Amino acid sequence: MNKPLPDVALTEISPALVSLDWVGMQGVEVPIRLAEASIRHPVHAHVDLQVDLADPSVKGIHMSRLYRLLDGYAERQIVSPDTLAALLEAMVESHLDCHSSHARLTLSFNLLCRRPALITEGLSGWKSYPVKLDATWHAGRLCLDSSVDITYSSTCPCSAALSRQLLEEAFAARFGRQSFVDPMQVATWLRENASFATPHSQRSVATVQVRVAEQAAELGLMTLIDLVEQALGTPVQTAVKRADEQAFARLNGQNLMYVEDAARKVQQALEGRYAASSVSVRHFESLHPHDAAAQTSNYLS
């Protein structure tokens, strides 16, 4: 005969009668499938999920209920705004005995997709984008934000100008006294000396967050990523040959940017497309031992 197991969450009262904003679990690992037309493979996600504990007399929530709901969701559902809303609502309903009224969850994962080389046909490689989905259920409504980290190259405009000045001075020193300059001679000199000075550039990261519409059929992650990469103009590459590396060098020269420029370009690209957006960029300076950073947001406080 099975003996009944004690459940102190039901039989005991907390000595401190205080309601709690959020209670739940962090870092639960599950495989998930995304509502993204171009992403067919499952991804490995870490999930945080909580409900409020409004009744101060209730000692604790039922974490196993949350876990089972998440496990079933990952097994049977594709992550989209409507399925996330259903999961969050079920989390609240599973804790009516705790007088819970709202729930939230965060999914963190790396989104892998193939990116083609700039020039070489048939050449591509995998690129990883760290993604976070923050979903909240309150008063019967879903609030969903997605954020993604996008890596790009930034070349300093000031350093480029200083490098051009040095090249100009070197060119004048070599050819300034000649009344006629042979174009072939100039071409040879440039081939050997155009790198007399080079501007500093560095790998950089833009963290972009946007509000996802409740009625959206998909998460729109690849749409967001493509939009930001097009705005910046210099996304880091995967597989390259020399022709692709040369094309990347040209893109860097055509898209010189301070950290301020990068933040403004991205936010401008987002305007009018999302109800709310924020941009945070970091340039991992090769000139300095510290980073340059800029932020902008139109989220309401």
Curated annotation (Swiss-Prot):
Pathway: Cofactor biosynthesis; 7,8-dihydroneopterin triphosphate biosynthesis; 7,8-dihydroneopterin triphosphate from GTP: step 1/1
HAMAP family linked: GTP_cyclohydrol_B
Molecular function per GO: GTP cyclohydrolase I activity
Its job: Converts GTP to 7,8-dihydroneopterin triphosphate.
Name of the featured protein: GTP cyclohydrolase FolE2
UniProt record, GO biological process: tetrahydrofolate biosynthetic process
Site entry: May be catalytically important: C156
Protein EC: 3.5.4.16
Catalysed conversion reaction: GTP + H2O = 7,8-dihydroneopterin 3'-triphosphate + formate + H(+)
Record-stated family: Belongs to the GTP cyclohydrolase IV family.
PANTHER family recorded: GTP CYCLOHYDROLASE MPTA
Keywords annotated in UniProt: Hydrolase
InterPro entries, A to Z: GTP_cyclohydrolase_FolE2, GTP_cyclohydrolase_FolE2/MptA
